[in-house]
Amino acid sequence: MRVTTAPKWKWILPAGGKPESVCGMNEAGVMETCGEDGIRRMVAAFYRHVPTDDLIGPMYHEADLGGAEERLAEFLLFRLGASTRYLETRGHPKLRMRHITFKIGIAERDRWLELMTAAMEETGVPPAAREFLDPFFAQVADFLRNQADR
């Protein structure tokens, strides 16, 4: 059985849990609150920190940071119901398949969440949207773990 809890990240949800089950916000509410520009600013802030990060920075190809930023922004806009561009250009997200070549353990998950949390704080993502995004990001980051001991 896979352990999905981590004391540091209180928002790791049990398997099948949904962010909206712990808050009143949903995808449409996040988009109303943040808008596409807000989501893109948040993602840009995240990627400003990636190259200098000693743990997850090496997972990203420096030459493709712009592409990675665009893919994450498009994925989030798709997942939040604002756009189908991601689906039209990339197909099904297949997140585990797309990340399987990277060793992602607890440390990597937590660092990714730290950088995303910093990006949300830096760009002023409103508390109401954070109520949805915090557990959403924690759930996705934990889902991508492929190293039990890390």
Feature locations, PLM:
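Extreme N-terminal basic, low-complexity initiation segments
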Residues: 1-10
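Core of compact, soluble alpha-helical bundle domains
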Residues: 9-150
